[in-house]
């Protein structure tokens, strides 16, 4: 408990209730990241949408220019030539009914699921298993596609999927504390650019209302939007 108290005290002393220049914020977060593992750097973006309205929900995916720092395992539901293309692109597991049987047994050693359109007849039976885990393939995130090879490459390259929660906030990981500041900023700006492009036509007023950065075990730091190029 003493360690938690010490960490909380350090955060309270160093984090001010103001908007930080993005570079200053990243430097501060790194200073506060004292966990015994390499912490992720996460962003929360408050959007000016009414999340209760389906036509204002924001969902999609984008490849971060510097990746996320994670090794991503990709499972692909497909067959024939597409199966060979998926393997060549780096897929970790490829199959159809055999892969579905593994999932039903609870054997899910993967982080992303991709499916070709013809495989959705098989994947559709797994909705209650994959859905709650955020693994269900979806055309909006590019994970239901005839071009499974590109989807695999994107996932391996550091693609992040985003979706607003019930409060209209998008949460995503943009890297780790051992990334250079410039790389984290580039990743943040790439995500913000993707969100801006995904703005629903029915959303009125200010779209990006607030941006805050945090690490896995750290406090949130509010970002001055004028210091981020994509906003």
UniProtKB/Swiss-Prot annotation:
Ribosomal protein in keyword set: yes
InterPro entries listed in its UniProt record: Ribosom_uL1_bac-type, Ribosomal_uL1, Ribosomal_uL1-like, Ribosomal_uL1/biogenesis, Ribosomal_uL1_3-a/b-sand, Ribosomal_uL1_CS
PROSITE patterns (alphabetical): RIBOSOMAL_L1 (PS01199)
Annotated GO biological process: regulation of translation; translation
Residue intervals passing through the bilayer: none
Pfam family, one: Ribosomal_L1
SUPFAM superfamilies in alphabetical order: Ribosomal protein L1 (SSF56808)
GO molecular function: rRNA binding; structural constituent of ribosome; tRNA binding
Keywords recorded for this protein, A-Z: Repressor, Ribonucleoprotein, Ribosomal protein, RNA-binding, rRNA-binding, Translation regulation, tRNA-binding
Cleavable signal peptide: none
Keyword Transferase in record: no
GO cellular component: cytosolic large ribosomal subunit
Record's function text: Binds directly to 23S rRNA. The L1 stalk is quite mobile in the ribosome, and is involved in E site tRNA release. Protein L1 is also a translational repressor protein, it controls the translation of the L11 operon by binding to its mRNA.
Family, per entry: Belongs to the universal ribosomal protein uL1 family.
Quaternary context: Part of the 50S ribosomal subunit.
Protein name (database record): Large ribosomal subunit protein uL1
Organism (species): Idiomarina loihiensis (strain ATCC BAA-735 / DSM 15497 / L2-TR)
Gene expressing this chain: rplA
């Amino acid at each position: 408990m003493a360690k938690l108290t010490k960490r909380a005290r350090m955060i309270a002393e160093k984090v001010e209730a103001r908007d930080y220049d993005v570079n200053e914020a990243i430097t501060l977060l790194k200073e506060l990241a004292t966990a015994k593992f390499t912490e992720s750097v996460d962003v929360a973006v408050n959007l000016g949408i009414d999340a209760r309205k389906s036509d204002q929900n924001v969902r999609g995916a984008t490849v971060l220019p510097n990746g996320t720092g994670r090794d991503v395992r990709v499972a692909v539901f497909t067959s024939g030539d597409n199966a060979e293309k998926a393997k060549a692109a780096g897929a970790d597991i490829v199959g159809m009914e055999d892969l579905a049987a593994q999932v039903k047994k609870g054997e899910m050693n993967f982080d992303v699921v991709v499916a070709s359109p013809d495989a959705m007849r098989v994947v559709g039976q797994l909705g209650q298993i994959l859905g709650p885990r955020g693994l269900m393939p979806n055309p909006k995130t590019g994970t239901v596609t005839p071009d499974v090879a590109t989807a695999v490459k994107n996932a391996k390259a550091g693609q992040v999927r985003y979706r607003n929660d019930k409060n209209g906030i998008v949460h995503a990981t943009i890297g780790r504390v051992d990334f250079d500041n410039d790389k984290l900023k580039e990743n943040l700006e790439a995500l913000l650019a993707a969100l801006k492009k995904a703005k629903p036509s029915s959303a009125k007023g200010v779209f990006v209302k607030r941006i805050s950065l945090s690490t896995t075990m750290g406090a949130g730091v509010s970002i001055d939007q004028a210091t981020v190029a994509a906003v």
